[in-house]
């Protein structure tokens, strides 16, 4: 009965079967295995011992090890009643690896793997077999030199499996994106308008700067970069620069965060505190004209108002009669309102009063400058016979 059973097992072993056995001998280029229930011994060539490259079979097996493998070929010498099973342990390992990776792909799970090689197009990793992380799937950020990952254990997700073509595509970027999504949701919940936090400039555009505030980018509009006018964001900040930002608004549904660098900086008015005082006479530049007066810049970003009545001693209809933008003028500080950050200025107070009257009529000048009424000429003296033909 026992002999019939064993004979049946022997006859049932065929190519493609999975068998078990014990390592009997480890040679330079192959391993000899006693197959359980087999008529012959099995041979595993070094190329079929592992999914990894090895120089010697002793790197992965030793005598007495129990192993499992696929029968890839049966060579029989009927004349001598002998033969050998050609086995592949690598094929079995690859199959198990694909089963494991498929499960991780189906469940969108993260796995850890060691980077075994850095190549031009990405990273080669060990996931029980050769896996590949393309350059485009390495990170959400730009990485110039991939060699920093060489030998490192990284967290990845399975992106694509193709057993027929022995193709395993993995993504480290997907893990970062998932982590960033969690961070973003948490940050959006915790942020409030008015919060002042630290960040790092991530990228620049024509309309502002995006600042990373902990895995989430917020926008600092160009108008919020400085108290002064900014033509280009790169004139004020640079990528990688650490900055303090104030949260202006948080749109949780749209996942948008508006930030300000300007609001964390001293205002131009605060920066001149103690520098100017009432009655000081200083130089400034006319920057803008309005119907009611002229705005004069007395320090970078600091403007004061010269009311139209303080432009000249004589009456003028519009500031444009005496001033133009860009003109340098002397002004006297009439008052400083620190609470409202306003400065009242006067040009008139810096001008001598004798400069007020401008006339080429010598007689009129004489009339205005003479204190003696008796010595003053009459209208008749001034205009002579010019009234004689007038009829009243």
Curated annotation (Swiss-Prot):
InterPro entries reported for this sequence: NA-bd_OB-fold (IPR012340), Ribos_protein_bS1-like (IPR050437), Ribosomal_protein_S1-like (IPR035104), S1_domain (IPR003029)
Alphabetically ordered keywords of this record: Repeat, Ribonucleoprotein, Ribosomal protein, RNA-binding
UniProt KW Repeat keyword: yes
Keyword Iron-sulfur carried by entry: no
Boundaries of every S1 motif domain copy: 16-90, 108-173, 194-262, 279-348
Cellular component, GO annotation: cytosolic small ribosomal subunit
One Pfam family of this chain: S1
Single Gene Ontology BP annotation: translation
Source taxon at top rank: Bacteria
GO molecular function per UniProt: mRNA binding; structural constituent of ribosome
SUPFAM superfamilies (UniProt xref): Nucleic acid-binding proteins
Family: Belongs to the bacterial ribosomal protein bS1 family.
Primary role: Binds mRNA; thus facilitating recognition of the initiation point. It is needed to translate mRNA with a short Shine-Dalgarno (SD) purine-rich sequence.
Protein name: Small ribosomal subunit protein bS1
């Amino acid at each position: 009965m026992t002999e019939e059973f064993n004979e049946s097992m022997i006859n049932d072993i065929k190519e493609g079967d999975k068998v078990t056995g014990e390592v009997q001998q480890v040679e330079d280029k192959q391993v000899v295995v006693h197959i359980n229930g087999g008529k012959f011994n099995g041979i595993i060539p070094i190329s079929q011992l592992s999914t990894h490259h090895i120089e010697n079979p002793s790197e992965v097996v030793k005598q007495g090890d129990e192993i499992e493998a696929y029968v890839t070929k049966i060579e029989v010498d009927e004349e001598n009643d002998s033969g050998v099973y050609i086995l592949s342990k690598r094929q079995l390992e690859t199959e198990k690896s694909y089963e494991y990776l498929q499960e991780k792909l189906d469940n969108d799970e993260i796995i850890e793997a060691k980077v075994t090689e850095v190549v031009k197009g990405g990273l080669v990793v060990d996931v029980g077999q050769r896996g590949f992380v393309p350059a485009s799937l390495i990170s959400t950020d730009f990485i110039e030199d991939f060699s920093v990952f060489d030998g490192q254990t990284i967290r990845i997700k399975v992106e694509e499996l193709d057993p027929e073509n022995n193709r395993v595509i993995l993504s480290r970027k997907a893990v970062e994106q998932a982590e960033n999504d969690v961070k973003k949701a948490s940050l959006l919940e915790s942020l409030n308008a008015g919060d002042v936090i630290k960040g790092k400039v991530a990228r620049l555009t024509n309309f502002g700067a995006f600042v990373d505030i902990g895995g989430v980018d917020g926008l600092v509009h160009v108008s919020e970069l400085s108290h002064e006018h900014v033509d280009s964001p790169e004139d004020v900040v640079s990528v990688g620069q650490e900055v303090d930002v104030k949260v202006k608004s948080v749109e949780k549904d749209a996942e948008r965060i508006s930030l300000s660098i300007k609001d964390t900086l001293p205002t131009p008015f605060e920066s001149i505190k103690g520098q100017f005082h009432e009655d000081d006479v200083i130089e400034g530049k006319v920057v803008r004209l309005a119907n009611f007066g002229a705005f004069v810049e007395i320090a970078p970003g600091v403007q004061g108002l010269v009311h139209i009545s303080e432009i000249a001693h004589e009456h003028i209809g519009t500031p444009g009669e005496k001033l133009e933008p860009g003109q340098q003028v002397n002004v006297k500080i009439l008052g400083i309102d620190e609470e409202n950050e306003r400065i009242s200025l006067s040009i008139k107070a810096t001008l001598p009063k004798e400069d007020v009257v401008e006339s080429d009529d010598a007689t009129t000048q004489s009339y205005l400058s003479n204190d003696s009424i008796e010595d003053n000429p009459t209208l008749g003296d001034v205009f002579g016979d010019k009234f004689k033909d007038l009829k009243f």
